[in-house]
A protein has these predicted regions:
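Membrane-integral, polyisoprenol-dependent glycosyltransferases
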Residues: 2-414, 421-427, 431-434
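Short, hydrophobic beta-strand segments that form beta-sheet elements in well-ordered domains
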Residues: 20, 478-482, 500, 512-514
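Stable alpha-helical elements in mature extracytoplasmic
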Residues: 75, 99, 328, 456-463, ...
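Solvent-exposed loop/turn segments at secondary-structure junctions
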Residues: 170, 372-373, 484-485, 517-520
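Loop/turn elements at helix/coil->beta-strand transitions in domains of secreted/extracellular proteins
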Residues: 221, 474-476, 508-510
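Membrane-proximal, lumen/periplasm-facing interface regions of secretory-pathway glyco-
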Residues: 316-317, 416-476, 481-496, 543-568
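Short acidic low-complexity segments
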Residues: 498-509
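Aromatic/acidic, Gly/Pro-rich catalytic loop(s) in extracytoplasmic/lumenal soluble domains
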Residues: 507-570
Length: 570
């Protein structure tokens, strides 16, 4: 009996092996490399720490240095209302989704709960505090790259993380209080969650993927573009590997090989069976719907926000047809100007993986990077911050290019070293130049500086604060008659008597801020009541942004008029 049982067991194992071999023959290889042997573990850990330190230093250094952009000022205004009044109502006309404001409101609310309202104002609602939100999401994106070590390779992962850490655009936008940094983080989080689902056969990974997807759609209306490109990139990767499966060989790196997926049914069984997969899918759907609902309805305070969230696509489509329109090749030109090393290395990496597709994830990353570049290029509406969407996957495939050079026949340390030194030196120079020297230079070479606020605006704010201290502090009145004034509402947030008229208006307040084009009207209407506070520029004006100059007037200290304000001459 024992021999019979043993014989049956042997036959069963052989039959199972034949079945598996036949299935493997018909399936594309999608192994994930396990590159722990590429570099010593100690080198890997030191590299991770050093890259994080470099990334944090570039992103956190002097966050007050660069004046807020127009859009940052608008976002800051929404945040102030949410923090101070607890009021936020989603409006599809108003600059994307609500997640940025709620993430940014967390710290001020904590400060108020622990130390009172004064601490909230002094330490919670500050330029440094609000810009720490994109800083943390930017660092989080780099952290996600390190989770790809088994999929990309050690050298590729470290290189990709370092390239993104010092990328001129990634650093610039990580110091920018807009939605883009957290948008790319959530996009990347979807990818990583799906990779963990595939690698570990854990259906509960559907839940973080769904949460990331909900937060992505609650951040910007362009989420459907990113998700669509990810799906297409995955499908093309699968089809391409099927077509060239005879040429695909497992990587030489040591480690546990990634299991093959014979069929959808086998995959479901490996995930725990139909019941477990269905349960996790339901939980994922509830997670997605719940987060989406909570954010767009202002945590149930504005039920109409849910229906309004679907109106945003029509608004976005209309907006994209009238403003910021650029030629189809614009993103490639901008990338060459500011992210040249990433683009060139990314192109080589894509070429390597297409010609020798031994790494499925690298192929997917190439399709993700250039797919997004193509998708956004086909849309007339183009802004530099949208490039961050494809800078991240470009960094991944650029890192793969460096590893591919390293693995050519013999270990090409010298060639790899030269490539890295040139790429990193050029990128680091551009990053420092852009972020700490020419951060407001509107020359076309500095593509990320897009209608940005000039540093002269901060001089205007300093003069306003000086006058305010000499008068009645935060109660000092300010009349703003200039039609262009953003981001001044953020910088004047602690002044309770500020009027934003956008045109000439009567005033007896201690200060008037006007556009330089309004100078004749100001002097005609206010006669000898006010004197101009001049900047260091020749005309005494303070430059707000290219083409917009502001004038500051202070009411004469010996005048405390009780009569009615003078009439305005039109």
């Amino acid at each position: 009996m024992a021999n019979t049982a043993s014989t049956k067991s042997t036959r069963s194992k052989k039959a199972h092996a034949r079945h598996a071999a036949a299935a493997a023959k018909n399936a594309p290889h999608v192994e994930a490399p396990a590159p722990s042997s590429d570099l010593p573990e100690r080198v890997w850990l030191i590299g991770v720490v050093m890259i994080f330190v470099i990334a944090a230093a570039l992103r956190m250094y002097d966050l007050n240095l660069v004046p807020l952009h127009h859009d940052e000022g608008v976002n800051g205004n929404f945040l102030m209302r949410l923090v101070r009044e607890g009021a936020y109502t989603y409006d599809p006309e108003n600059y994307h989704g609500p997640t940025l404001y709620y993430f940014a409101a967390f710290w001020p609310w904590v400060m108020r709960a622990l130390f009172g309202k004064a601490s909230m104002e002094n330490y919670g609602l500050t330029t440094v505090a609000i810009r720490m939100v994109p800083v943390l999401f930017g660092l989080g994106t780099i952290g996600l790259i390190f989770t790809l070590r088994r999929w990309l390779g050690t050298i590729a992962t470290l290189t990709a993380a370092l390239l993104l850490a010092i990328s001129p655009g990634a650093v610039y936008l990580s110091r920018y209080f807009i939605h883009e940094t957290q948008f790319v983080f959530f996009t990347f989080a979807i990818v990583v969650s799906c990779l963990y689902l595939y690698e570990h056969r854990n259906p509960f990974c559907l839940i973080p993927a769904a949460a990331s997807g909900a937060l992505l759609f609650a951040t910007k209306e362009t989420a459907f573009i990113s998700v669509g490109v990810l799906i297409i990139a995955l499908a093309v990767t699968f089809v391409y590997l099927r077509l060239v499966r005879g040429k695909v060989r497992p990587p030489k790196a040591k480690g546990r090989p990634q299991p093959e997926v014979w069929s959808l049914g086998d995959f479901v069984n490996e995930l725990g069976g139909p019941v477990m997969v269905s349960l996790c899918a339901v939980l994922a759907a509830i997670t997605f719907a719940g987060l989406y609902y909570l954010f767009y309805t202002s945590f149930t305070l504005n039920p109409k926000g849910l229906s309004d969230s679907f109106q945003t696509f029509a608004v976005w489509k209309k907006t994209s047809s009238v403003a910021h329109v650029h030629p189809i090749y614009t993103y490639i030109r901008w990338l060459l100007q500011r992210e040249g090393a990433l683009l060139v290395l990314g192109a080589f990496g894509a070429l390597f993986v297409v010609l020798k597709p031994t790494n499925a994830f690298a192929l997917f990353a190439a399709l993700w990077a250039f797919g997004l570049t193509a998708a956004y290029s086909l849309i007339g509406y183009k802004t530099p911050w949208l490039m961050l969407n494809f800078v991240v996957p470009l960094a991944l495939i650029a890192g793969y290019a460096v590893q591919a050079i390293f693995e050519l026949e013999a270990r090409q340390w010298r060639v790899t070293g030269v490539v890295l030194i040139v790429a990193l030196s050029f990128t680091a120079y551009q990053s420092i130049d852009l972020n700490f020297i020419n951060y407001d230079n509107d020359d076309t070479r500095y593509v990320y500086v897009y209608a940005h606020t000039k540093r002269g605006m901060l001089d205007l704010v300093k003069e306003v604060d000086r006058i305010g201290k000499e008068r009645t502090g935060g109660q000092t009145g300010i009349t703003i008659v200039s039609p262009d004034y953003w981001p001044l509402p953020w910088y004047l947030r602690n002044y309770s008597r500020v009027g934003y008229y956008g045109r000439m208006a009567p005033s007896t307040e201690p200060m008037i801020i006007a556009n330089s084009t309004q100078q004749p009207e100001v002097e005609a209407n206010f006669r000898d009541m006010y004197q101009q506070v001049r900047s260091k520029e020749g005309d005494g004006a303070f430059e707000l942004r290219p083409g917009v100059r502001l004038l500051l007037y202070e009411r004469r200290k010996d005048l405390f008029p009780t009569e009615a304000p003078p009439s305005i001459k039109r």
